């Protein structure tokens, strides 16, 4: 089996939450004997496909970015080529240009969308994008919500509840960076023996 993940950014170019999810899925699948390709955009001038921790990452040149949406003409051809070899295509939402690529290339493979987030900041542009978004989400085979609460409260996902499944994001603890004992002692003395630290990409 061969899986193609498609999103606007990915390791090793950028380090964020969705990138980490894609990496963990690709890593886990490759360790189970599944061939995995990850396709994303990059502003790097030296673009080439590289093997990364057991799976292949492919990058197309980022032509320009508008309202957090990356655009690339060359990615259309790359996606078409990789999609022909794939058994399953795994999209990561939201990325409006991804929807365009999906329809332009005429994908005929089983398709999954992991729905990571509603569109929050670009609500004015959502009015323009909504018809394409609904057509895209309506065309894929399955949608994955990352929590039961998200599936129940997202106005977009409620519309597609009949083909939405909940699969919580799982992370391999073995890949966590190990904190130094000095730093752990420092924070334990200030916060107590047990505490949570949440870190993510600061986008808004």
Locate the predicted segments by residue:
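Conserved donor-binding/catalytic core segment of Leloir-type glycosyltransferases
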Residues: 4, 184-204
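Short hydrophobic "strand-cap" motifs at the C-terminus of beta-strands
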Residues: 6, 146, 167, 198-200
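A short, histidine- and acid-enriched strand-loop-helix "catalytic/donor-clamping" loop
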Residues: 67, 96-97, 111-126, 139-142
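An aromatic- and histidine-rich active-site surface loop
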Residues: 74-76, 88-108, 120
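A short beta-strand/loop micro-motif in the catalytic core of glycosyltransferases
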Residues: 89, 138-148, 165-167
């Amino acid at each position: 089996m061969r899986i193609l993940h498609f999103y606007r950014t990915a390791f090793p170019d950028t380090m964020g939450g969705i990138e980490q999810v894609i990496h963990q899925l690709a890593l886990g699948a490759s360790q189970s004997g599944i061939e995995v390709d990850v396709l994303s955009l990059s502003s790097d001038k030296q673009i080439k496909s590289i093997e990364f921790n057991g799976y292949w990452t492919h990058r197309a040149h980022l032509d320009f970015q508008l309202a957090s949406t990356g655009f690339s003409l060359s990615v259309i051809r790359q996606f078409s080529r990789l999609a022909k070899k794939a058994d399953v295509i795994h999209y990561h939402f939201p990325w409006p240009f991804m929807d365009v690529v999906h329809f332009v290339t005429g994908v005929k493979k089983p398709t999954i969308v992991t729905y990571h987030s509603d569109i929050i900041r670009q609500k004015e542009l959502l009015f323009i994008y909504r018809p394409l978004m609904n057509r895209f989400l309506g065309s894929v085979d399955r949608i994955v919500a990352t929590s039961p609460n998200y599936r129940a409260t997202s106005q977009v996902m409620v519309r597609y509840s009949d083909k939405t499944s909940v699969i919580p994001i799982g992370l391999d603890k073995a890949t966590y960076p190990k904190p130094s004992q000095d730093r752990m002692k420092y924070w334990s003395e200030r916060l107590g023996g047990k505490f949570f630290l949440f870190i993510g990409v600061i986008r808004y």
